[in-house]
Amino acid sequence: MLLGTGFEETEAIAPLDLLRRAGISVQTVGLNGSVIYGGHGIGVNADIEIGEMDLTALEMIILPGGLGGVASIRAYESAMNAVRFAWDNGKFVAAICAGPTVLADLGITAGKNATCYPGCEDGMGNAIIIPDSACIRDGNLITGTSAGCAVPFGLMLVEALKDKETADRIAQQIVIR
């Protein structure tokens, strides 16, 4: 999970929590150092910094939104290269809120069903925007709309990496209504 200064905290922490509840090993990757501050001033200790990332072990790369976080990802060539590597090697690529616009910059969303934060549609390139969807999976591409959709987005990531039964079990444990 790529974390750049100004990331949207809910869009990072909720999916991270759900993935770890599922027993999935997730590393948070700091782009601007080892402690990254989100858009609302919450500091997160990244597990590793971008230069330590092992792309060969990657199963999925996750981009939370937040305009500052998305700008940080775009500013780091190594982060953009990691996203491109994941996609080119058949790994899952997931992004929420403004994050999918980074994927569009790389041509990943072209011809794919996707969603994004309302108002970011112009930055989605040739994606097939599915309005009013919390999150969408199209093959190895997973996109989510906003912080308000962070839990369904996280459960979709669990389902992609594990299975529906695990995602359903976790949804039940956290009492999704």
Predicted features along the sequence, with ranges:
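Short, solvent-exposed amphipathic alpha-helices that sit
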Residues: 14-21
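Active-site-adjacent pocket-lining segments in enzyme domains
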Residues: 1-3, 7, 21-31, 48-49, ...
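Membrane-interfacial amphipathic helices and adjacent loop/beta segments
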Residues: 29, 34-40
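Glycine-rich, flexible N-terminal cofactor/catalytic loop recognition
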Residues: 11
